[in-house]
Amino acid sequence: MDPKLLELLVCPVTKGPLTYDRERDELVSRSARLAYPVRDGIPVLLETEARPLTDAELEA
């Protein structure tokens, strides 16, 4: 994930920052407790496509 692109992207739900999880290829919004997929290098920032984060994932 390009760091400059990551600086520009925000969570569509909270408008908060996103972090990149390289292992799962997801953009994570801790405030919304959601992980957005990155498919073929393209972030899919749709709430309907995001998966909810568990408490364990948020603590990691």
Swiss-Prot record:
Cite a GO CC annotation.
Answer: cytosol
Please name the taxonomic classification of the source.
Answer: Bacteria, Pseudomonadati, Pseudomonadota, Betaproteobacteria, Burkholderiales
Which InterPro entries does the UniProt record give?
Answer: Trm112-like
- PANTHER family xref list: PROTEIN PREY, MITOCHONDRIAL, ZGC:162634
What's the family?
A: Belongs to the UPF0434 family.
The record's section on Pfam families has: Trm112p (PF03966)
Question: Can you say what this protein is called?
Answer: UPF0434 protein Aave_2563
